Amino acid sequence: MGQKVHPVGIRLGIVKEHNSLWYAGPKSYSDCLVTDLQVREYLFKRLKSASVSRIKIERPSENVRITIATARPGIVIGKKGEDVERLRRDVAAKMGVPVHINIEEVRKPDLDARLVGDNVAGQLERRVMFRRAMKRAVQNAMKSGAEGIRIQLSGRLGGAEIARTEWYREGRVPLHTLRADIDYASVRAETTYGTIGVKVWIFRGEVLGGMEQVQEEQKQSKGAKKRGRG
Protein backbone atom coordinates (compact mmCIF):
# COMPACT_ATOMS: atom_id res chain seq x y z
CA MET A 1 0.00 0.00 0.00
CA GLY A 2 1.21 3.49 -0.82
CA GLN A 3 1.42 5.81 2.18
CA LYS A 4 1.37 9.61 2.01
CA VAL A 5 3.85 11.73 3.96
CA HIS A 6 2.54 14.93 5.59
CA PRO A 7 2.55 17.58 2.78
CA VAL A 8 3.71 20.38 5.11
CA GLY A 9 6.25 18.34 7.11
CA ILE A 10 8.17 17.22 4.02
CA ARG A 11 8.44 20.86 2.83
CA LEU A 12 9.77 22.36 6.08
CA GLY A 13 12.90 24.38 5.33
CA ILE A 14 12.22 24.19 1.57
CA VAL A 15 9.07 26.30 1.09
CA LYS A 16 7.44 26.05 4.54
CA GLU A 17 8.34 27.50 7.96
CA HIS A 18 8.11 25.75 11.34
CA ASN A 19 5.23 26.76 13.64
CA SER A 20 7.55 26.67 16.66
CA LEU A 21 10.81 28.63 16.45
CA TRP A 22 13.03 28.13 19.52
CA TYR A 23 15.99 26.21 20.85
CA ALA A 24 16.03 24.31 24.15
CA GLY A 25 18.46 21.98 25.90
CA PRO A 26 17.75 18.26 26.40
CA LYS A 27 16.32 18.79 29.91
CA SER A 28 13.81 21.52 29.02
CA TYR A 29 12.95 20.51 25.42
CA SER A 30 10.08 18.15 26.29
CA ASP A 31 8.50 20.69 28.68
CA CYS A 32 8.62 23.43 26.01
CA LEU A 33 7.10 21.09 23.42
CA VAL A 34 4.22 20.01 25.68
CA THR A 35 3.56 23.67 26.64
CA ASP A 36 3.40 24.63 22.94
CA LEU A 37 0.86 21.87 22.24
CA GLN A 38 -1.29 22.85 25.24
CA VAL A 39 -1.22 26.58 24.37
CA ARG A 40 -2.14 25.88 20.73
CA GLU A 41 -5.04 23.64 21.76
CA TYR A 42 -6.23 26.29 24.26
CA LEU A 43 -6.04 29.14 21.72
CA PHE A 44 -7.79 27.21 18.92
CA LYS A 45 -10.61 26.32 21.34
CA ARG A 46 -10.93 29.82 22.83
CA LEU A 47 -10.76 31.61 19.45
CA LYS A 48 -13.02 29.15 17.60
CA SER A 49 -15.26 31.95 16.26
CA ALA A 50 -12.26 34.03 15.05
CA SER A 51 -11.30 31.73 12.11
CA VAL A 52 -7.74 31.08 13.35
CA SER A 53 -5.50 29.54 10.69
CA ARG A 54 -2.07 29.24 12.30
CA ILE A 55 -0.38 29.86 15.65
CA LYS A 56 3.36 30.52 15.56
CA ILE A 57 5.33 30.37 18.84
CA GLU A 58 8.81 31.90 19.30
CA ARG A 59 10.88 31.92 22.49
CA PRO A 60 13.46 34.75 22.44
CA SER A 61 15.45 34.77 25.75
CA GLU A 62 13.10 34.73 28.78
CA ASN A 63 9.77 35.54 27.09
CA VAL A 64 7.40 34.14 24.46
CA ARG A 65 6.15 35.74 21.24
CA ILE A 66 2.93 34.28 19.79
CA THR A 67 1.71 35.21 16.30
CA ILE A 68 -1.94 34.38 15.58
CA ALA A 69 -2.96 34.28 11.91
CA THR A 70 -6.71 34.90 11.68
CA ALA A 71 -9.28 35.84 9.04
CA ARG A 72 -11.21 37.93 11.62
CA PRO A 73 -8.66 39.96 13.60
CA GLY A 74 -11.34 42.23 15.07
CA ILE A 75 -12.77 39.37 17.14
CA VAL A 76 -9.34 38.52 18.60
CA ILE A 77 -8.39 42.15 19.35
CA GLY A 78 -11.79 43.21 20.73
CA LYS A 79 -12.95 46.71 21.62
CA LYS A 80 -9.91 48.97 22.18
CA GLY A 81 -7.69 45.87 22.40
CA GLU A 82 -9.33 44.63 25.62
CA ASP A 83 -9.82 41.02 24.44
CA VAL A 84 -6.26 40.53 23.19
CA GLU A 85 -4.87 41.99 26.43
CA ARG A 86 -7.02 39.60 28.50
CA LEU A 87 -5.87 36.74 26.26
CA ARG A 88 -2.23 37.75 26.74
CA ARG A 89 -2.60 37.71 30.54
CA ASP A 90 -4.30 34.28 30.52
CA VAL A 91 -1.64 32.73 28.24
CA ALA A 92 1.17 34.28 30.32
CA ALA A 93 -0.35 32.72 33.46
CA LYS A 94 -0.44 29.31 31.74
CA MET A 95 3.15 29.53 30.44
CA GLY A 96 4.68 31.23 33.48
CA VAL A 97 6.68 33.76 31.39
CA PRO A 98 5.94 37.19 29.82
CA VAL A 99 3.97 36.77 26.57
CA HIS A 100 3.67 39.10 23.56
CA ILE A 101 0.82 38.46 21.11
CA ASN A 102 0.89 39.64 17.49
CA ILE A 103 -2.14 39.40 15.19
CA GLU A 104 -1.72 38.61 11.48
CA GLU A 105 -4.63 38.92 9.06
CA VAL A 106 -5.32 36.13 6.56
CA ARG A 107 -6.26 38.10 3.44
CA LYS A 108 -7.58 35.14 1.40
CA PRO A 109 -9.32 32.64 3.71
CA ASP A 110 -10.47 30.55 0.70
CA LEU A 111 -6.79 29.71 0.02
CA ASP A 112 -6.10 28.56 3.59
CA ALA A 113 -6.55 24.81 4.12
CA ARG A 114 -7.36 25.09 7.84
CA LEU A 115 -10.07 27.72 7.28
CA VAL A 116 -11.55 25.83 4.31
CA GLY A 117 -11.62 22.66 6.44
CA ASP A 118 -13.30 24.48 9.35
CA ASN A 119 -15.87 25.92 6.93
CA VAL A 120 -16.72 22.49 5.46
CA ALA A 121 -16.84 20.92 8.95
CA GLY A 122 -19.20 23.67 10.13
CA GLN A 123 -21.53 23.05 7.19
CA LEU A 124 -21.57 19.29 7.88
CA GLU A 125 -22.47 19.98 11.53
CA ARG A 126 -25.35 22.17 10.29
CA ARG A 127 -26.56 19.20 8.18
CA VAL A 128 -25.69 20.67 4.78
CA MET A 129 -25.34 17.95 2.11
CA PHE A 130 -21.69 16.87 2.07
CA ARG A 131 -21.31 17.02 -1.75
CA ARG A 132 -22.69 20.56 -1.83
CA ALA A 133 -20.31 21.65 0.97
CA MET A 134 -17.30 20.16 -0.85
CA LYS A 135 -18.22 21.62 -4.23
CA ARG A 136 -18.85 25.11 -2.81
CA ALA A 137 -15.48 25.15 -1.02
CA VAL A 138 -13.65 23.96 -4.16
CA GLN A 139 -15.32 26.61 -6.35
CA ASN A 140 -14.51 29.42 -3.89
CA ALA A 141 -10.84 28.35 -3.69
CA MET A 142 -10.47 28.21 -7.48
CA LYS A 143 -12.10 31.66 -7.80
CA SER A 144 -9.62 33.05 -5.23
CA GLY A 145 -6.64 31.94 -7.34
CA ALA A 146 -5.82 28.37 -6.26
CA GLU A 147 -4.14 26.25 -8.94
CA GLY A 148 -5.68 23.11 -7.48
CA ILE A 149 -7.62 21.82 -4.48
CA ARG A 150 -8.66 18.44 -3.12
CA ILE A 151 -11.14 17.82 -0.29
CA GLN A 152 -11.66 14.39 1.27
CA LEU A 153 -14.39 13.38 3.73
CA SER A 154 -14.40 10.13 5.74
CA GLY A 155 -17.11 8.81 8.04
CA ARG A 156 -20.86 8.18 8.09
CA LEU A 157 -21.59 10.59 5.24
CA GLY A 158 -25.24 11.59 4.99
CA GLY A 159 -26.05 9.41 8.00
CA ALA A 160 -25.20 6.16 6.17
CA GLU A 161 -24.93 2.96 8.21
CA ILE A 162 -21.48 2.12 6.80
CA ALA A 163 -18.66 4.68 6.91
CA ARG A 164 -16.98 5.52 3.60
CA THR A 165 -14.59 8.01 1.99
CA GLU A 166 -15.57 10.56 -0.68
CA TRP A 167 -13.31 13.16 -2.31
CA TYR A 168 -13.56 15.98 -4.83
CA ARG A 169 -10.70 17.60 -6.74
CA GLU A 170 -10.27 20.43 -9.20
CA GLY A 171 -7.02 21.55 -10.87
CA ARG A 172 -3.79 19.79 -9.94
CA VAL A 173 -2.25 19.01 -6.54
CA PRO A 174 1.39 17.83 -7.10
CA LEU A 175 2.29 16.24 -3.75
CA HIS A 176 5.67 14.95 -5.03
CA THR A 177 6.93 18.39 -6.16
CA LEU A 178 8.78 19.86 -3.16
CA ARG A 179 8.82 23.43 -4.55
CA ALA A 180 4.99 23.32 -4.79
CA ASP A 181 3.33 25.53 -2.15
CA ILE A 182 0.74 23.07 -0.82
CA ASP A 183 -1.28 23.95 2.26
CA TYR A 184 -2.78 20.98 4.11
CA ALA A 185 -5.12 20.63 7.07
CA SER A 186 -7.06 17.88 8.81
CA VAL A 187 -10.23 18.86 10.72
CA ARG A 188 -13.01 16.94 12.49
CA ALA A 189 -16.76 17.56 12.18
CA GLU A 190 -18.79 16.33 15.17
CA THR A 191 -22.18 15.41 13.66
CA THR A 192 -25.20 13.65 15.21
CA TYR A 193 -24.18 10.46 13.35
CA GLY A 194 -20.60 10.54 14.60
CA THR A 195 -17.27 12.12 13.71
CA ILE A 196 -16.46 12.95 10.07
CA GLY A 197 -12.84 13.59 9.10
CA VAL A 198 -12.19 16.49 6.71
CA LYS A 199 -8.86 16.73 4.85
CA VAL A 200 -7.96 19.64 2.58
CA TRP A 201 -5.02 20.06 0.16
CA ILE A 202 -4.63 23.44 -1.64
CA PHE A 203 -1.98 24.03 -4.33
CA ARG A 204 -1.13 27.76 -4.43
CA GLY A 205 1.61 27.69 -7.08
CA GLU A 206 5.32 26.90 -7.18
CA VAL A 207 7.95 28.70 -5.07
CA LEU A 208 11.05 28.73 -7.27
CA GLY A 209 13.17 30.88 -4.90
CA GLY A 210 12.85 28.55 -1.89
CA MET A 211 12.79 29.90 1.68
CA GLU A 212 14.47 33.18 0.62
CA GLN A 213 11.45 33.98 -1.58
CA VAL A 214 9.00 32.98 1.19
CA GLN A 215 10.72 35.22 3.77
CA GLU A 216 10.95 38.14 1.29
CA GLU A 217 7.21 37.91 0.56
CA GLN A 218 6.47 37.89 4.30
CA LYS A 219 8.58 41.04 4.82
CA GLN A 220 6.79 42.80 1.95
CA SER A 221 3.33 41.89 3.31
CA LYS A 222 4.31 43.14 6.81
CA GLY A 223 5.63 46.39 5.30
CA ALA A 224 2.39 46.90 3.36
CA LYS A 225 0.33 46.39 6.55
CA LYS A 226 2.43 48.98 8.46
CA ARG A 227 2.02 51.52 5.63
CA GLY A 228 -1.73 50.83 5.58
CA ARG A 229 -2.03 51.47 9.33
CA GLY A 230 -0.01 54.66 9.07
Swiss-Prot record:
It comes from the Bacteria. Binds the lower part of the 30S subunit head. Binds mRNA in the 70S ribosome, positioning it for translation. Part of the 30S ribosomal subunit. Forms a tight complex with proteins S10 and S14. PROSITE patterns: KH_TYPE_2 (PS50823), RIBOSOMAL_S3 (PS00548). It comes from Alcanivorax borkumensis (strain ATCC 700651 / DSM 11573 / NCIMB 13689 / SK2). One of its GO terms (molecular function) is rRNA binding. Residues 39-107 form the KH type-2 domain. Disulfide bonds: none annotated. Belongs to the universal ribosomal protein uS3 family. GO terms for cellular component: cytosolic small ribosomal subunit. InterPro entries: KH_dom, KH_dom-like_a/b, KH_dom_type_2, KH_sf_prok-type, Ribosomal_S3_C_sf, Ribosomal_uS3_bac-typ, Ribosomal_uS3_C, Ribosomal_uS3_CS. The keyword Cytoplasm does not apply. NCBIfam families: rpsC_bact. Keywords: Ribonucleoprotein, Ribosomal protein, RNA-binding, rRNA-binding. Transmembrane segments: none annotated. One of its GO terms (biological process) is translation. The gene is rpsC. Gene3D superfamilies: 3.30.300.20, Ribosomal protein S3, C-terminal domain (3.30.1140.32). This is Small ribosomal subunit protein uS3.
